[in-house]
């Protein structure tokens, strides 16, 4: 019997719960939200697809009753506010830090051994906050961003190669932001062959650029942030934990000397299994990639420093 809680029944949270159910990742999924009735309604809607889609996962929606989340193996935290017009970055970080910190504390009260997957934005900063505020072992706090960015990278590669995205391997490291992520074009492969052998350097560079603005492109088309791929990416991380798949998934992890950095939570390739982050994979970066990673780390550290400036940490 396995149990996953998804905090926040917005588009991303509900999609995550739906994917977890349809893929039969866990025997029970709890969807919890602060707004009366929303989680219950979305859970009921998901459950009414069980016969149509052939799953037996029980999805339960609750309003702000964290006792219902007791015994969760994995908790996905999607709660937080989007940035509103006129709101400063510091104000947004302050508001979301308060929400994430409160949620994480309540979760641990009822599920002291849970592994936490952080989706709330700014994601690298919220993962850092969760790790620092709760004092958990670093393997138990995972930022989801790289899983999503890497999926988008593989999508754009597959479009350029005119193939199925499942035939492509590729990943993104660095911060979860359109100026801080680093699509690792040098390591991208199609059926084991370097993609750089199949398309031009200019085409590969365009794929990287498309990946970096992938989120913004969708926001422009949808009029709001995307939710299908983000929800599925969070579910994929939870799946690798629950079923001990030991997949290599780029995630935001707290570094203790890896890549030459300390006291930063940033996207790196991780082996994800039943213990959460079981290993951080250190890639042999060339000088250009090291420079990009250094710039990304500096930008993420600057955002993360706001937590101390506003007194949250």
What do the predicted segments below correspond to?
Residues 52-114:
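Rossmann-like NAD(P)-binding element
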Residues 13-14:
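N-terminal Rossmann-fold NAD(P) dinucleotide-binding loop
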Residues 1-4:
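Extreme N-terminal starter segment of soluble prokaryotic enzymes
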Residues 88-154:
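Rossmann-like NAD(P)(H) cofactor-binding subdomain of soluble oxidoreductases
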Residues 9-10:
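Glycine-rich Rossmann-fold phosphate-binding loop(s) that bind the pyrophosphate
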Residues 34-72, 301-310:
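Conserved N-terminal Rossmann-fold NAD(P) cofactor-binding segment
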Residues 134-140, 149-313:
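C-terminal substrate-binding/catalytic lobe of Rossmann-fold NAD(P)-dependent dehydrogenases
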